[in-house]
Amino acid sequence: MPRCRRCTLRVLLTNDDGIDAPGLEALRSTVEYAFGDELERVYTLAPDCQRSECGHGVSSGKPLRIVETGSSAWSASGTPADCVRFALTSLCPDVDLVFSGINAGANLGTDLMVSGTFAAAREAHNRGVPAIAISHYRRPDVPRTWQHTPTWLASTLRDLLARIGRGEGRLWNINLPAIDPDSLSPGSIPPAVFCPVDRTPIPLAYLPATVAGELDIQTARDFYVESDFHNRPRQPGSDIDVCFGGKISISLAEQY
C-alpha cells in the first residue's frame, strides 16, 4: 500500500516486450516525470526477450536466470508474471507499486486474458501490491513515438495513486490512443475517461496454411488465426470504444 504522496515511493517496472523495449524506457521516464522526488527507488525486472501474448504463464521445472543489466535493473529468462513473482519475493519485496508497460499495442477488452503486460500487473495485485498496466494503441498510419507518454500520463498516474491510497481500486489498466502527438495543438492531451472493460470477444477465423485440396481433420495441418483488431466489435462507452475513439481509457480491472 503506498504510504502517501508526500512520502517516498518504491516502485517496480516490468513489461512483456522485453528489457530492451523502448516502451520500458518510456515507462521509466513517465514514472519519473509523474512522481519526481517522491520516488525513493525504481527497480526494473523484465523478460530477456519478447514475451507478448504469453498470458499469465509461469516457469516451472527449470531455473529462472536473472541477469543484472544496469543500476537497479535486471532481466529474467521467464515471463512477465515470473518477473513480478521473483521481484516481490526475492528482489524488492517492499515495493509500494508495480507498473507494467508501456506495451507497444493496445490491451483492451478480452485481450486482458492473454496479455503478458496485464498478467504482470495482475500477479502483483494477487500478491497484495497495487499495480497499473499501461499500453499504447498503435495503427499503421500513425507514427510510433514515445516522447509524449510522460505528459499524456502524468496526471492520470498521480490520480490513480491517490485512488489506490483511498482504497478505490488496486488494479488498473490504461490504454493510450493511436494519435500522432504532432497533430494536436501545443500542450493538448487526449482526454482520459474511466470506463468498463469490454467483454465482447474478438471474432476469429482459422485459415489453413494451404487451401489446396480437401481438409482432412485426421491429418496434421497448419492453420493461421485471422482477426480484424482495428474494426473489432465493441460496446458503447467501453475501454475499446473509448481508446479507439481517440481518448485515454482507464479501467478498474480487479475482476480479471
Predicted regions and their residues:
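Glycine-rich phosphate/pyrophosphate-binding loops
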Residues: H125-H148
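Alpha-helix C-terminal capping segments
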Residues: A87-C92, A119-P130
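Glycine/threonine-rich flexible loop motifs
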Residues: A106-S115
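Short beta-strand segments
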Residues: L45-P47, S100-N103, I134-S135, I174-P177, ...
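A cross-family phosphate/adenosyl-ligand binding-site feature
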Residues: P2-T14, E25-D94
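Short acidic, Gly/Ser-rich segments with clustered Asp/Glu that frequently serve as metal-coordination loops
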Residues: D17-E25, E226
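Short glycine-rich anion-binding loops that position phosphate/pyrophosphate groups of nucleotides
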Residues: D17, Q50, T79-P80, N103-A106, ...
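Electrostatically charged, flexible surface regions
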Residues: H148-Y256
